[in-house]
């Protein structure tokens, strides 16, 4: 075992001051003595680097992992803690002097005194060199030796011009033909290199770096020391194939250990570099095969120079570009992502029939641009069922890189391509299968995607199918989709357990998506039969599911839009559909100026439905700021499965929320929402259904709504739904709700159905349908539309399963034992209220523990259960400073408890203070009717703290000062206060 102490030579450093275009400056080498210490940057790699400048000298330092060759024997890897100028090397061999030493050992050829200089070099960050790239030699008769340099460095400093892309490579050519790579003999005693090789006079340095316009980047190209008779030619090529060539003429001597610095250059292209030219399918296959085998550097440029017609190439003969572990052409690895430039030059890919993407995978530094996949191309994605796979007609997987100005009009058919049922998720995109962290811009997919009924999944594995019109999956915060479009239609009949379909992207976890548009239609016709694993279908005009998670995951969606229709002809157990996204299950996403104009339609008897013009369901805390008219399409819900567990949640903007959500801004909904049922009384059973112009239902969590306007149409058929809520703004809330500064002019109607049902109730309101389970605040809201419920509930309204209708809200706290307070303040209704077999109020149909102040009603009421100008039924409430100018009439099919009051129809433990009524009260027979309260219990009173006034007629009898006290409260119970005659003048 031998140990050598080796001091390093030092490399001179020169300034760029007085350089001219055709000259280099140089300084003499200075040597540093001492022991060398090396550090490791990446495990298993050597790291010999240039140290910091010491005047005009930069020492070359050993680093951990370095190895030398002594008399053809490699030393052990150096194991030291920090960079230094000398080091002890150990060799596991008995060697005799003299000792010929070469560094690095990896360059030594077959234990000889010959080294191989690579024709490819890599740039490194800063003004430095890649470790292990600067060869040295030494010679000694003792165990201590001093190393000398064999090469010099050509220093190139570059700045970006006005239109500079990422720099692919720098190519240095010895114009006189001197060899700069290949095999060189080493004279270790005199530190000299010699070679007789021909045609190896070019060195390429891979750069893969964007330049700055402010400061120059330094690139150090290592060349054999010697005389270069005609100087050098330097070519700089960017990712777009733009080239700049600078010639350094005359005889130049590059001395060992010298840094020769070119004048600073600004990249100004004066040429074009096409690289590998591809004009035929055969040339494509040849290029892809060679690249996949590692025969091209990552700085390579390839250009498609003619349309490629693959009609004579069978699917099993086509070679995809790049390799992805688990994909067909690399099922068990390794992966090799394309990292070069592929310039499609606007050419078409024609008649390609394949089960793999045109490009399988791209990675860091890749640029793919101007490629058009023609409509004559068709794809049937391959998968083996064992590893997650992504498929796009252009690219399967984008790890990183750039994709620009590409299109696809291909057809993609997802079917059972393999005998093994799929056990892992499959991501399909019209253009891109999955975008991790690439920048994709200006691309269009008009690809048609069909997932037929033969695509089934392993029922035990419970796998998912993701289909996006443009891409299947966006998964990294560094990923970008900008100005991308999908116009292709998607049709799904698969029975995968979970099916996710989005017009732009199926699964969206992170990234920035800006200015993207979908106009492609989505149609699902999956037929559910016994034993099928399919349970959930998620359909989104832009995205199926948005599920960003993790500390660094975040999604930004900016100025995107959908106009593609969503149609479900499936009887699936659960459908979630949204014009922007089916499901929003993260609070790490923001949406700015994103809209939907597409229609949402269901036709088959599905069981559970979550549907919204923007979002089908929101299951994470969210703050949304909406403005303008974010949804202009229609929502048309057809028949649903008759099942006592069925649930329906549909909203003009949001179907259902299950987390705390705040919606604010100044948005207007002007569309139509309809639920049409053609069934008998025995059909259409459901547990609950909620419909609203803005939101269907806030379920199990609070919701805040402000500044929203509803100006559309809501038309609902209901039969045997245990609980239903319909509202111009929100259908229902199960944990309280805050609503402020909202208005409704949408006609809200629950249509007449001849079938009579027992105990299946509907609550309808101009702003909200049914709110329970939490504190309620409704302030500064208005309704001007007709609120109509013709649902025939054969049960009495008073048993907490009756119908309720209100001009502002149908019911608040309509549950036995309610303990939550409600505030309704400064709300006004000028629309009419019609309720068959239900309690009705000009402001609220039923309210518990409410405080109502400063409200007014100027429409009219027709009802067949308790009705009041402010509240149909008030339980434990305080009503003050409200006025009503309206008629209250009785509808057919009335009940015996259709009490009628100008302010409150029926009051339980409630007070009415400072309120006024003027109008016509037309009660049913044998009911209590009063100008202020129709029926009051002993705990209720009117005009206690301030006086109440009323006037008009009661059952045709004019109200006068003589009969005020008689007509103030219709029942004999209740405390009378002070009343005055009011003529309706405000």
Cite the ranges covered by each PLM segment.
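Sec-type signal peptide cleavage vicinity
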Residues: 2-13, 17-279, 289
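Surface-exposed repetitive/solenoidal architectures
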Residues: 269-986
């Amino acid at each position: 075992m031998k140990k050598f102490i080796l001091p390093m030579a030092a490399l001179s450093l020169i300034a760029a001051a007085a350089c001219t275009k055709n000259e280099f400056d140089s300084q003499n080498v200075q040597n540093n003595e001492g022991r060398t210490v090396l550090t490791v940057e990446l495990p298993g790699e050597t790291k010999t680097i240039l140290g910091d400048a010491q005047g005009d000298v930069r020492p070359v330092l050993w680093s951990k992992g370095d190895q030398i060759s002594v008399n053809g024997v490699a030393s052990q890897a150096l194991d030291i803690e920090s960079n230094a100028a000398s080091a002890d090397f150990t060799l596991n061999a008995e060697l005799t002097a003299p000792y010929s030493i070469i560094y690095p050992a990896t360059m030594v050829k077959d234990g000889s005194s010959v080294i191989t200089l690579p024709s490819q070099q890599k740039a490194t960050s800063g003004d430095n060199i890649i470790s292990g790239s600067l060869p040295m030699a030494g010679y000694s008769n003792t165990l201590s030796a001093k190393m000398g340099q064999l090469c010099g460095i050509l220093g190139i400093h570059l700045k970006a011009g006005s239109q500079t892309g990422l720099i692919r490579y720098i190519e240095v050519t010895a114009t006189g033909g001197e060899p700069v790579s290949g095999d060189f003999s080493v004279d270790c005693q005199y530190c000299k290199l010699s070679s007789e090789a021909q045609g190896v006079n070019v060195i390429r340095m891979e750069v893969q770096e964007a330049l700055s316009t402010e400061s120059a980047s330094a690139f150090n190209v290592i060349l054999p020391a010697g005389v270069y008779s005609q100087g050098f030619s330097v070519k700089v090529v960017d990712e777009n194939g733009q080239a700049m060539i600078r010639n350094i003429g005359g005889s130049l001597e590059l001395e060992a250990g010298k840094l020769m610095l070119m004048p600073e250059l600004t990249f100004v292209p004066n040429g074009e570099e096409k690289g590998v030219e591809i004009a035929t399918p055969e040339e494509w296959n040849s290029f892809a095969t060679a690249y996949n085998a590692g025969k091209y550097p990552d700085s390579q440029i390839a250009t498609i120079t003619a349309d490629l017609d693959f009609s004579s190439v069978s699917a099993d003969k086509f070679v995809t570009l790049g390799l992805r572990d688990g994909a067909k052409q690399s099922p068990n690895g390794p992966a090799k992502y394309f990292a070069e430039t592929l310039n499609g030059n606007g050419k078409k890919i024609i008649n390609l029939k394949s089960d793999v993407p045109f490009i399988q995978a791209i990675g860091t530094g890749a640029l793919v641009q101007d490629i058009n996949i023609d409509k004559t191309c068709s794809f049937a994605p391959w998968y083996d069922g064992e590893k997650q796979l992504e498929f796009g007609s252009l690219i399967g997987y984008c790890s990183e890189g750039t994709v620009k100005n590409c299109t696809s009009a291909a057809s993609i058919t997802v079917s059972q391509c393999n005998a093994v049922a799929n056990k892992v998720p499959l991501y399909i995109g019209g253009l891109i299968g999955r975008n991790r962290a690439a920048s994709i811009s200006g691309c269009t997919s008009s690809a048609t995607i069909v997932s037929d009924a033969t695509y089934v999944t392993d029922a035990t594995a419970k796998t998912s199918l993701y289909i996006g019109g443009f891409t299947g999956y966006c998964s990294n915060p560094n990923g970008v989709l900008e100005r991308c479009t999908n116009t292709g239609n998607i049709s799904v009949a698969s029975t995968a357990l979970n099916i996710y379909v989005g017009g732009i992207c199926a699964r969206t976890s992170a990234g920035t998506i800006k200015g993207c548009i979908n106009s492609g239609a989505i149609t699902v016709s999956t037929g559910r039969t016994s034993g099928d694993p399919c349970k959930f279908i998620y359909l989104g005009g832009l995205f199926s599911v948005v599920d960003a998670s993790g500390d660094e995951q975040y999604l930004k969606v900016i100025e995107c839009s959908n106009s593609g229709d969503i149609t479900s002809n499936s009887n699936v157990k659960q459908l979630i559909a949204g014009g922007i996204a089916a499901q929003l299950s993260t609070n790490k996403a923001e949406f700015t100026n994103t809209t939907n104009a597409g229609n949402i339609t269901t036709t088959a008897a599905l069981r559970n439905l979550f549907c919204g013009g923007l979002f089908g369901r929101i299951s994470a805390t969210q703050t949304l700021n909406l403005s303008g008219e974010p949804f202009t399409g229609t929502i048309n819900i057809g028949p649903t499965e008759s099942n006592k567990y069925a649930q329906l949640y549909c909203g003009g903007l949001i179907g259902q929320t299950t987390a705390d959500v705040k919606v604010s801004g100044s948005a207007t909904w002007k569309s139509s929402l309809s639920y049409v049922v053609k069934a008998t009384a025995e059909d259409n059973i459901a547990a609950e259904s909620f419909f609203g112009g803005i939101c269907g239902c806030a379920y199990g969590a609070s919701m805040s709504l402000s500044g929203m306007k509803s100006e559309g149409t809501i038309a609902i058929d209901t039969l045997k739904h245990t609980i239903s809520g319909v509202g111009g703004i929100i259908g229902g809330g199960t944990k309280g709700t805050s609503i402020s500064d909202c208005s409704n002019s949408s006609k809200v109607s629950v249509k007449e159905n001849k079938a009579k049902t027992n105990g299946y109730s509907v609550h309808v309101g101009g702003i909200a349908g049914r709110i329970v389970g939490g504190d309620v605040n409704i302030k500064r809201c208005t309704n001007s539309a007709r609120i109509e419920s013709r649902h025939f509930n054969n049960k009495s309204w008073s048993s907490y399963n009756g119908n309720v209708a209100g001009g502002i809200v149908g019911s608040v706290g309509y549950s036995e034992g309610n303990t939550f307070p409600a505030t309704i303040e400064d709300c006004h209704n000028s629309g009419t209220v019609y309720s068959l077999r239900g309690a009705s109020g000009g402001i609220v149909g039923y309210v518990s523990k409410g405080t109502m102040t400063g409200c007014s009603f100027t429409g009219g009421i027709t009802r067949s259960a308790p009705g009041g100008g402010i509240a149909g039924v008030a339980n434990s409430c305080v009503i003050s400073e409200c006025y009503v100018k309206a008629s209250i009439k009785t509808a057919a099919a009335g009940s015996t408890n259709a009490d009628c009051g100008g302010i409150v129809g029926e009051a339980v433990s409630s007070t009415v203070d400072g309120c006024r009524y003027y109008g016509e009260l037309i009660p049913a027979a044998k009911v209590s009717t009063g100008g202020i309260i129709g029926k009051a219990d002993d705990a209720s009173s009117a005009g206690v703290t301030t006086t109440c006034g009323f006037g008009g007629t009661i059952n045709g009898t004019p109200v006068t000062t003589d009969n005020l006290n008689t007509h103030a409260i219709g029942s004999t119970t209740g405390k009378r206060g002070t009343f005055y005659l009011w003529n309706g003048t405000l």
